């Protein structure tokens, strides 16, 4: 087999492949074996008919078609391997020549990972917000904790924000009742915004057994997207009484004896949350800094595939009704043109980021260990409420293990980029990135070596104990 590569663009190639028929003999053998199982000839057991008789029965063309269909994927893969290409997506294959007993010639056009010139990672400078915990933030956490231990008490006044109400609802569209909108005794926290638009504004000030009608747009059901006249009746009003923030409350709500100790723990809690947010900011800014300093050619077909997927998901729930989709966007203060522009921008950035991270990973020779994969599987299992083995089976069935592997590798790559960069806050303080991004590659290697040494020493000690016994 002979193959050559034409560079059509920085992200696309055409592979020309020539396969002499002598190399297709194993493919012919397999094809005839398969066809022999499918075709029954008098006097021969299934699978035992001679090749000449089979060919005479089904025709040479059918045999050639089977051989070519079976041969193309493997010959394409072989050409990719020998050319040291890194394809993205599926190829577009065209048979340009097929001469029986002579040769098979085909071309395969495919997007590839482009060559990317990377900046020196040590030159990257990342600046993020400092971690500051204010009294107001701690007070908000304490207030939230008090609310969890609050009690509800009935009141006879009008509804206020923060109250808990029991309500009846009914709705009509153009005078027609909407059965699915009718409900009785529905519990609702006023101001939460969890129900239909306009409800909270309508019931503010109402007392028990008072009603009000307002207009809102339905978001689901037969009349989705249409204006409805909704009538709400307040059945009861309750306010939440909060416990006093004292030592007694601290003992009730936590493991601490005093309110001061509880507040200190809330300070630590807020600081941990802000540390996570800071780590996310570091990650995002590291990627942004790399993107700003690096030219990344974009494979258009890969970008378009991402765009198509986003559009499909957006209109799938609307039965792919473009008109309804346009109306939905208009209600959100947007348009199809704006949606398409935003979708393309996001898709281009996503593809650029993936290509860039893969290029950095190759340069740094990032390796994914079994422990890295196990940690990700355990984390995902907890998120989805599955056993790790169940999750592995699902990922295998959906062919998602390679994507998970690539995602883990990119995560390790981002960590390596962060370690190489200079990371400071806006006050000029250098930030220790160890907690959220792990040890640097060098430190990780040292830790791994130490673990191996410790394990070896432990095994040696066990062997010595066994010998003594």
From Swiss-Prot:
One Pfam family in the UniProt entry: Trigger_N
Domain of life: Bacteria
Subcellular location: Cytoplasm
Chaperone found in the keyword field: yes
Residue intervals of the PPIase FKBP-type domain: 162-243
Ranges where the record places region Disordered: 438-469
Record-linked InterPro entries: PPIase_dom_sf, PPIase_FKBP_dom, Trig_fac, Trigger_fac_C, Trigger_fac_C_sf, Trigger_fac_ribosome-bd_bac, Trigger_fac_ribosome-bd_sf, Trigger_fact/SurA_dom_sf
Reaction catalysed by this enzyme: [protein]-peptidylproline (omega=180) = [protein]-peptidylproline (omega=0)
Record key words, sorted: Cell cycle, Cell division, Chaperone, Cytoplasm, Isomerase, Rotamase
An annotated GO cellular component: cytoplasm
MF annotations from Gene Ontology: peptidyl-prolyl cis-trans isomerase activity; protein folding chaperone; ribosome binding
Gene Ontology biological-process entries: 'de novo' cotranslational protein folding; cell division; chaperone-mediated protein folding; protein transport; protein unfolding
Bias type Acidic residues, positions: 444-469
Enzyme Commission number(s): 5.2.1.8
Cited function: Involved in protein export. Acts as a chaperone by maintaining the newly synthesized protein in an open conformation. Functions as a peptidyl-prolyl cis-trans isomerase.
Domain notes for this protein: Consists of 3 domains; the N-terminus binds the ribosome, the middle domain has PPIase activity, while the C-terminus has intrinsic chaperone activity on its own.
Family listed: Belongs to the FKBP-type PPIase family. Tig subfamily.
Full protein name: Trigger factor
Lineage of source species: Bacteria, Bacillati, Actinomycetota, Actinomycetes, Mycobacteriales
